[in-house]
């Protein structure tokens, strides 16, 4: 049995509950009484239902800087052990789910975990600055069993969209999300990469203090405009505009949340597979490129909406 440790919890992120539940199931009484996320209280009973999704792996330990949070996660996700430190957690497990998306704390909290050599999942992206990203690159390298992802890329909606778009002429793509660019851009970018590849030549953020409006220019002429504003209502997702056809809406947070939950389950299955085989589901180069596109969006906004040419931006990053 593969033993997994989970690290949580930051404000606005319920992944320690939902990711752990894929492996362990959940206690519905504690879920309804103690979980602070209404959507999780809805989709776990409706679409997980305490079925077994992964038979040969369990979350056996949890750590959170706030003891009360760790205890709550443990009760809801049936985790038998609460670690008193990251070191205690990492020593007791075979692999680590780092389920925090306060990206500015990623290196400070998780950097030491890479010394263990154990498989690691990092929520969404690695870093919020080029300096921290370089630290992760130096600590991990292309052969480390590392997965960073949003589950949108693993949603059944993406496979449906691939089939639907196979005979279409795509004109442009629009993406909408709540929250902030550095945290939620990976949701939209991961799905874009699956559908249209990652050959992005320029990034421009024309947003303002209220949010981000980021245009991604593909080498083939495709443009994707991603709008991320805190407080925007659901659904989060992409809309693909086609020549002579109705737009195709691809919802991450679909109306019933069934496909949303299934995307999480599939992502955890692929993490489990990486732990066993050592083979990452996403190439190292793509993991780093996605993070650098996030950084380019930040850089563009800081420079008043300047168009960032990715070739020169990547050269500067590598210097």
Report each predicted region and the residues it spans.
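N-terminal Rossmann-like dinucleotide-binding module
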Residues: 1-72, 152
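Glycine/Thr-rich phosphate-binding loops of Rossmann-like dinucleotide-binding domains
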Residues: 14, 106-107, 156
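C-terminal helix-rich "cap/oligomerization" subdomain common to oxidoreductases
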Residues: 47-50, 88, 92-101, 274-319
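Beta-loop-alpha module in the N-terminal Rossmann-like domain of NAD(P)-dependent dehydrogenases
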Residues: 66-68, 72-138
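Glycine-centered short loops/turns at secondary-structure junctions
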Residues: 117, 143, 304-305
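A contiguous active-site-proximal alpha/beta segment in oxidoreductase catalytic domains
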Residues: 121-185
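Rossmann-like dinucleotide-binding domain that binds NAD(P)(H)
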Residues: 171-235, 285-292
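C-terminal substrate-binding/catalytic lobe of Rossmann-fold NAD(P)-dependent oxidoreductases
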Residues: 210-271
